[in-house]
Amino acid sequence: MSSPAQYRLEVARTLLATRMFKVERPDRSLRALRTLQRWGSNAAAAYTVSAIRCPDRIALVDERGTLTFAEIARRTDALAHGLAAAGVREGDGVAIMCRNHRGFVEATIACAKLGASQLYLNTAFAGPQIADVLRREAPTALIYDEEFADLVSGGSEGMHRFVAWSETPAERQAAGDRDAAGAGANGAGGLTDPKLEDLIAAGDPTPLEPPHEHGRVVILTSGTTGTPKGAKRKQPDSMEPLAAMFSKIPLRAHETTVIAAPMFHSWGYGHFTLAMPLASTLVLPRRFDPEGTLRAISQHRASALAVVPVMLQRIMELPPETIARYDLSCLRIIAASGSALPGELATRVMDTFGDVLYNLYGSTEVAWATIATPQDLRAAPGTAGRPPLGTVVKLLDAEGREVAAGERGRIFAANEMVFEGYTGGGGKEIVRGLMSTGDMGHFDAAGRLFVDGRDDEMIVSGGENVFPREVEDLLADHEQIEEAAVIGVPDEEFGQRLKAFVVTRADADLDEEAIKEYVKQNLARYKVPREVVFVEELPRNATGKVLKRELSAAG
């Protein structure tokens, strides 16, 4: 373990390697330093500094066009004044339910300038979930895309409401029925609530003074096992969290990143925060489209792509000739997180795009635990990687004792991101300063972590412990299987039995017995599913996690 002095030196080296501190004009650098001293390290400071250092650089690209850092600085000052005039104050909470676009970015920065906390709502949640969250969190204001008007109508009574994005008729037609559950542009309140653009146009662009206390960031858990919790986190007091990420993922200043992962989720939001100090150009597609993502990378010469694993799966389903149509030689980094990355998929992605894939493992509460580099994924495709700079990961048994390499234990982690607990009370288990991720895993001899599954997903069948992940990964390796999920169901004789839900590829010629035989040839007999159900697709949430409770409910 390095000494504090060695650690600080490594942090400095890592940050310098990003070129974010390159001095181009001393006068601007001095102003930027003063801004950081006054504002700290939040979103307001990062974008203000970029507006000082590179005002004319493109900060954002979305369907409506481009915005420079100087334009975003002026617009978010005006928006912050407009929100304040409407009644939003320092310490208030503002709920944001937006897709990836300028409205999300500008709402976040304006709230940071006011000292208001930001609560990010999952755009895939159903109306009752949204209503439960809004009533529990009781934000002062709600900023939403007009397509979600019906979804937010329950639970938002008495709140200041603002529309971040209204689709044009052409955009609604292009979207088709993909988001029918969210209702259309004529949803409740959608045509009467003021628009952010109106607040910006009428607002005072005078820069604000820093708040006495910065607001918090609240990101919701996925809600795969029930009502989503609000994970509250304060702004970091140093740049050490950035150094942790940059120690494994070689992002550089003044490059371009396509964020396909939803920004309301930890991973999409995380890439947004990584881009801030780098003055990166963000390309923000509102909806994920596999070929459209490749087109955006090629068109904007993006060096990085942020995705959740299911997006990679959809990209790899494109015909090879479609992928070959785009010049992707600029792409240095594909950064994936949010759900399990099957080893077979990791290998296919790197065989297609080169050794540019990085896989981050963590949780909403822990933020990050480990990161797998392309070298890790080549050596051990199913690995979650190793802890980055300043991060500690330990595997503990039921008594809290550390387990040896190769042995399974509960995963605990500690890093520089401070989780302040759930907004509704409570938190995650902590042992000797390490927080539980809720998963089980093991280290190999090289120190690479492998996540075996959720600690509450373990299936006990005939007295034997089985984690679904091992069987799922094996099934995904089959050349005729696209993806699979495994659950435990009650069994009178064995207590539980394994049931597999399988999505086959278009030209597959498999039946239930062939799949059982395949598993039996590769794993212990007690890991063979007793039932195999063929389905067209697996139910997933917005970040790609399989909704196993829906599979269980389907029987």
What do these predicted ranges mean?
Residues 169, 178-184, 189-220, 227, ...:
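Conserved pre-ATP/AMP-binding loop-to-beta segment of ANL
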Residues 73-78, 202, 231-253, 313, ...:
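Conserved structural elements of the adenylate-forming
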Residues 277, 302-306, 320-380, 392, ...:
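Gly/Ser/Thr-rich phosphate-binding loop
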Residues 239-256, 264-304, 318:
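Conserved AMP-binding/adenylation subdomain of ANL enzymes
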Residues 125, 132, 142-144, 295-297, ...:
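AMP-binding/adenylate-forming catalytic core of the ANL superfamily
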Residues 68-70, 216-240:
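Conserved AMP-binding A3 loop
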Residues 35, 39, 56-101, 105-109, ...:
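Conserved AMP-binding/adenylate-forming core of the ANL superfamily
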Residues 386-390, 399-432, 464-466:
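Conserved ATP/PPi-binding loop(s) of AMP-dependent carboxylate-activating enzymes
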